[in-house]
Amino acid sequence: YKPLSDNFLKLVPSGGEDFDIHNGKLLAPILIPRVSGTPGSLEVQEHFVNFFRKELPKWSIEWHNSTSKTPATGDRDIPFANLIFRREPPWVKQGQSNLLTLVAHYDSKYTPHDFIGATDSAVPCAILMHVARSIDRYLTQMHDEMAALEEGGTVEMDMGVQILLLDGEEAFVQWTDFDSLYGAR
């Protein structure tokens, strides 16, 4: 762990209009109710995947799907979908590099009805999308320079980034060990 200086943080590019709550390309599509297993959740998943496919095609996309019963849904299984977006050096097999892992959850609460959860989950997801876009060219540059210098191929040198967007963090009724963290277990 190393604290980041104020000067370093000032170098992070602004998200600008992408974070506008009404029209922002990154944030606005997430500002809807997105309870796990609902159409809103599927819509937000599609937003994430489309962003990475169109804007960051060198990033791999992986789904980790599961189902679980919840106290609010009784015997009905609810689907949960975690998304993993990963950028690794082109010379490594997928999952074989040292990965800086950035994580947020994207689901919103079951109650109250139409809860959005902007600052708890929507904004962190938009920030991670912005971070991925901001660092992508530097990852490309680093990987290109390492390839030109014939570096890499060792555990210490093979570095990448992965972003986990998790589903089912919120409790459906009351936060307990069994009614929470469905996607992060």
Regions found by a protein language model. Name each.
Residues 94-104, 157-162:
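Short coil-to-beta-strand
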Residues 26-29, 106-112:
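A short small-residue
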Residues 4, 8, 19-27, 40, ...:
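Stable alpha-helical elements in mature extracytoplasmic
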Residues 110-185:
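Acidic/histidine-rich catalytic neighborhood of metal-dependent amide-processing enzymes
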Residues 64-66, 87-89, 103-107, 164-169:
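Active-site-proximal beta-strand/loop segments in catalytic clefts of secreted hydrolases
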Residues 12-95:
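A non-catalytic alpha/beta surface segment that caps or lines the substrate-entry region
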